A protein has these predicted regions:
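Cysteine-nucleophile active-site neighborhood
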Residues: 1-38, 115
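Short linear Ser/Thr-Pro motifs
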Residues: 4-6, 67, 106
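Active-site oxyanion/phosphate-handling segment shared across diverse enzymes
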Residues: 41-101
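Acyltransferase
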Residues: 101-120
Length: 120
């Protein structure tokens, strides 16, 4: 919804807050451990410092449940996780933030991210 375009259930225009598109997750399926949808915990790798991360450390784990991910959004990407490909974890465009993972299901790490968001 936040991106310019999505290919989830057809091709659709988004709101365009974030440059890029939402595409099907296509990890290296030669690895039998990698499934789609991805359901589980992955380390969050912070690419750019941001107040959203003030209460977490590099590499803390967050919980994903998804079959799609944002791509071609390098300018807006704040953090990624690895699923044989870099999966966009957090984007920001001005005052608009989005997460691919579920902060509300990410335990203490997610609560600290939500705390930082509430303080923005």
């Amino acid at each position: 919804l936040l991106f310019e375009k999505s290919y989830e259930y057809g091709e659709h225009q988004g709101l365009g807050f974030v440059q890029g598109e939402v595409c099907p997750l296509e990890p290296d399926l030669k690895d039998p451990a990698l499934k789609v949808p991805q359901i589980g915990w992955n380390a969050l790798h912070i690419l750019r410092d941001d107040p959203l991360f003030q209460y977490i450390q590099e590499g803390e784990y967050v919980y994903y449940v998804h079959s799609y991910y944002g791509r071609h959004c390098t300018a807006s990407t704040l953090a990624v996780s690895d699923y044989s490909i870099p999966v966009t974890g957090v984007v920001r465009a001005g005052k608009v933030y989005g997460t691919q993972f579920h902060p509300e299901k990410s335990g203490d790490t997610g609560l600290r991210i939500l705390k930082a968001f509430a303080e923005l």
